[in-house]
Amino acid sequence: SIAKDVLGTDDPDKVQEALSTWDKFDKVAEQAAAKGYKMLSGYDDSYRVFSNNVSAPWVDSNNKIVIDDNIMKWVDQTKKYTDKGYNNKSSLWDSTWAADQGPSGKVFGFFYSTWGINFTLLGNSLATPVKEGGKEEVGNGIYGDYAVCEGPQSYYWGGTWICAAAGTDNANLVKDVMKTLCCDKATMKKITEDTQDYTNTTSGMNEIASSNFKSDFLGGQNHIKLFAKSAPKISMKNISSYDQGLNEEFQKAMKDYFDGNVTKDKALDNFYKAAIEKYPNLSK
């Protein structure tokens, strides 16, 4: 309904047209602000979209930390959004971020993971939580008011993993469980149909994408069709073992800059210091 108020439509394809580039995204942020809405909840929301589209890994062959230009674009955009009031100054997983996804939220949208839609966003959308007797149905909060589009760039946000315990006495059983959950097409299709998550079967997801599958939470949208189209565009060629730690330290350091407590240069210095403390083998 916020999209309809700002853009005059809540059709996912038409909303995507309005958000298909970062320049267009910025223009919609301005339109949303004029209507009293925030474009994003907080500092971290768009981070993964930028960090997943870098030109090189965080660390080069000489163990030198390299801050990609695309990550600096996130810094500049987020500072602009903060100063102009286009975000709500929240951080991922905090109470403000969660509340912004609920019935009283005034945020245009959220960059989410496939698993986050059903495991997190759905729960946050309810006026009466399931544990308090509420039902996952239209009429409870803003259940049914959300929809999904691709946004300015394709990106990824982790996944759902299953690991075996080292030294298990049931190696064959564990193998069978893992293979069934992660490689059996019928099982994975059932997981998607039951949870709305996107699973590890290209052919299975394409079958659901072309079926009459729909999500009541997403207003009847077949979001698997969108994911099946978007997933092949994701590139993971620049991932490294340092990503988790360096991404966390970079976001943490930049938050002080966004809040106006330090300059950009000081925030960068603080990042390098924290990064090298975490990974002593790296250099600035």
Region roles according to the model:
Residues 1-3, 117, 187:
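A generic structural signal for short hydrophobic patches within well-formed alpha-helices
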Residues 46-54, 72-176:
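Extracytoplasmic/periplasmic substrate-binding proteins
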Residues 33-43, 183-195, 277-284:
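Bilobed periplasmic-binding protein-like "clamshell/Venus-flytrap" ligand-binding domains
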Residues 7-12, 55-64, 157-162, 231-235:
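Flexible glycine/proline-enriched surface loops and loop-helix/loop-strand junctions
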Residues 1-46, 59-92, 166-172, 262-266, ...:
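Helix-loop-helix "hinge/cap" segment bordering the ligand-binding cleft or interdomain interface
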Residues 120-125, 152-252:
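C-terminal lobe and pocket-closing loops
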Residues 5-17, 123-139, 211-217:
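Charged, glycine/proline-rich intrinsically disordered loops and linkers
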Residues 5, 245, 249-260:
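Solvent-exposed, amphipathic alpha-helical segments
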